[in-house]
Amino acid sequence: MKILVLNSGSSSIKFKFFDNKVVKASGLVEKIGEQNSKVVLKNTLNNESFERELTINNHEEGLSIVNELFKESGILADLNALDGCGHRIVHGGRNLSEHCLVDDYVLKEIDRVSIFAPLHNPAHLAGIKTMIKAAPSVANAAIFDTAFHRTMPDFAYMYALPYDFYDKHNIRRYGFHGTSHAYVSSRAAKFLQKDQNELNVISAHLGNGASVCAIEKGKSVDTSMGFTPLEGLVMGTRCGDLDPAILPFISHLKGLTIEEIDTLMNKKSGVYGICGYNDFRDIEREIEQGNDKARLALDMFCYRLVKYIGSYFAVLPKTDAIIFTGGIGENDSLVRQKVCERLAHLGIELDFELNKQRISGERMINHANSKVKVLVIPTDEELEIARITEELIGKN
């Protein structure tokens, strides 16, 4: 099948084109709504690039240029030649708990739950509507970050607030990065040559946004992110878990509005708030130069990660493997080392030489004697979205 995967942001569209699960092209529409907008399409088979720089006022104009570049490159005759288009959607809310093909109800529901993800869902919705208009005959699939976590038990996803907040307002833990956690856990099963239904793993997706997921027999049973992606780990610019009573205290102390506090927690906190950097390469360079705040930021990040992974050892009946994925998880050997060293008493024995090797691809980095496997699995959310889209089209 010919599948286009779209990740529509407020001012951008990222895309990948798959033909029978092989990436044929990828690209980006950036600075939508600005005069110096740019569209880049790259033929991934020969690395040839096709570019346009012009004013793009909206997503519809952006996708129209993408269509022109597909024709110019000869990769795809037209968007109507697609079998399907898979859209990454951050939040499905309580009712859209599974991936699905798009219809009028799905469009309305994505719009309704935009209040839960105001920075993401409206842009995703614009991407879907643009694709429907550009290629009416092509099936569109909504692939939700939250869907993988639909298998969490109620005692894991409920907050200890008055029940009406859940019952009437859908306030509960949803979890995110689901497409990534689903992909790497399935790849881990193949790597270990085990049935996914017999495997228990803890997946750590570590990027500027970061989350951990406890996966029992292929199903999510708990995850660190909650009602929003703010809960859980210390992240690049997000604070993660904190005492909620701090928020009214900060409001009175600094005279900040709710919106300003939200910005503070999401964009000015995390390791960035501690040391002024959110790129871990910069943080580790600063540590080498004796920057104590950078050292503190890294220690806080790793300590919170250790706490979550350790708690999921208690949640799972047994743990077969820990998976590191995402930009930091895949590339930062120091983070992996610091985390695994603190978990040694749980049967994790890291092979320091394997961990330090700068190689790409799926690999095992534990010592042969380790009771728990430690894997580095590069995530591929677009491939997973394409796979699920094919599956949904096949069923219908």
Swiss-Prot record:
Domain of life where this protein originates: Bacteria
Binding site for ATP: 14, 205-209, 279-281, 327-331
Listed Gene3D superfamilies: 3.30.420.40
Recorded catalytic activity of this chain's protein: acetate + ATP = acetyl phosphate + ADP
GO biological process, one term: acetyl-CoA biosynthetic process
Cofactor: Mg(2+); Mn(2+)
Textual note on the cofactor: Mg(2+). Can also accept Mn(2+).
Pathway: Metabolic intermediate biosynthesis; acetyl-CoA biosynthesis; acetyl-CoA from acetate: step 1/2
InterPro entries associated with the record: Ac/propionate_kinase, Aliphatic_acid_kin_short-chain, Aliphatic_acid_kinase_CS, ATPase_NBD
EC id: 2.7.2.1
GO molecular function, one term: acetate kinase activity
Active site: 145 (proton donor/acceptor)
Compartment list: Cytoplasm
Pfam families: Acetate_kinase
Keywords: ATP-binding, Cytoplasm, Kinase, Magnesium, Metal-binding, Nucleotide-binding, Transferase
Amino acids binding Mg(2+): 7, 381
Gene Ontology cellular component annotations, sorted alphabetically: cytoplasm
Site (Transition state stabilizer): 177, 238
Subunit structure: Homodimer.
HAMAP family: Acetate_kinase
Family: Belongs to the acetokinase family.
Known function: Catalyzes the formation of acetyl phosphate from acetate and ATP. Can also catalyze the reverse reaction.
Protein's UniProt name: Acetate kinase
Organism annotation: Campylobacter jejuni subsp. jejuni serotype O:2 (strain ATCC 700819 / NCTC 11168)
Record gene name: ackA
